Swiss-Prot record:
Transcriptional activator. Binds a GC box motif. Could play a role in B-cell growth and development. The acidic N-terminal part may favor interaction with the basic domain of transcription factors. The keyword Ion transport does not apply. Pfam families: zf-C2H2. It is linked to Gastric cancer: A malignant disease which starts in the stomach, can spread to the esophagus or the small intestine, and can extend through the stomach wall to nearby lymph nodes and organs. It also can metastasize to other parts of the body. The term gastric cancer or gastric carcinoma refers to adenocarcinoma of the stomach that accounts for most of all gastric malignant tumors. Two main histologic types are recognized, diffuse type and intestinal type carcinomas. Diffuse tumors are poorly differentiated infiltrating lesions, resulting in thickening of the stomach. InterPro entries: Znf_C2H2_sf, Znf_C2H2_type. GO terms for biological process: B cell differentiation; positive regulation of DNA-templated transcription; positive regulation of transcription by RNA polymerase II; regulation of transcription by RNA polymerase II. The gene is KLF6. This is Krueppel-like factor 6. Keywords: Activator, DNA-binding, Metal-binding, Nucleus, Repeat, Transcription, Transcription regulation, Zinc, Zinc-finger. GO terms for cellular component: chromatin; cytosol; fibrillar center; intracellular membrane-bounded organelle; nucleolus; nucleoplasm; nucleus.
Amino acid sequence: MDVLPMCSIFQELQIVHETGYFSALPSLEEYWQQTCLELERYLQSEPCYVSASEIKFDSQEDLWTKIILAREKKEESELKISSSPPEDTLISPSFCYNLETNSLNSDVSSESSDSSEELSPTAKFTSDPIGEVLVSSGKLSSSVTSTPPSSPELSREPSQLWGCVPGELPSPGKVRSGTSGKPGDKGNGDASPDGRRRVHRCHFNGCRKVYTKSSHLKAHQRTHTGEKPYRCSWEGCEWRFARSDELTRHFRKHTGAKPFKCSHCDRCFSRSDHLALHMKRHL
């Protein structure tokens, strides 16, 4: 909330003209502004708790049925277009060459990437009926796959599995492939402004937020569950918080620490947003 000061610059000049100085001590009005900011923060409504039983996912059988039906429908349409399609045309040489090239590029990029980020493909193939089914069916649940959500195997596109030669298991290089080497390519997921892919998605009903780090996703999910693991260690204080930075700001109330100092005057503040509000007085 942006609270505009009632005292204008002309009144301040009048005080300086009459007394010869302007007191830097906080006035009653400034105390009122700080109190309004604190009340607005701590009187917010608590997030409602959502039990795990209320989260509904598609069953594994239904998902695989949709995948198989989509694949059969795609094959039937290909048979209608070409009267006698040879089996070798299902895997074109250019497609295999792209897979090999993508695997080499992904091996180089994965070694220099951060270990906390997931490996996810950024290239999207033109004909991918399985991907359309996955998009229409919603989110993948933990019952669909045995790997955890942070596993790189979840970020593998289904078209890479169907593109392999029958009877041949996909190699680790092909599983990790997907980056075409072009900086302008975009994948299925949302891309953040700094170029990193946001691959950590919230699976609660009605929430579509995506994050680049798993720690940020865990902090966001606490707003759904109501979990507050960070407790104030001050004697006699029972406050609990969902994020560590909220606990740090709260602890400054006990210690009286004010690390944020104004560069124009000697005023100090315990929070950065309070300093930003104060800096508007110097503009």
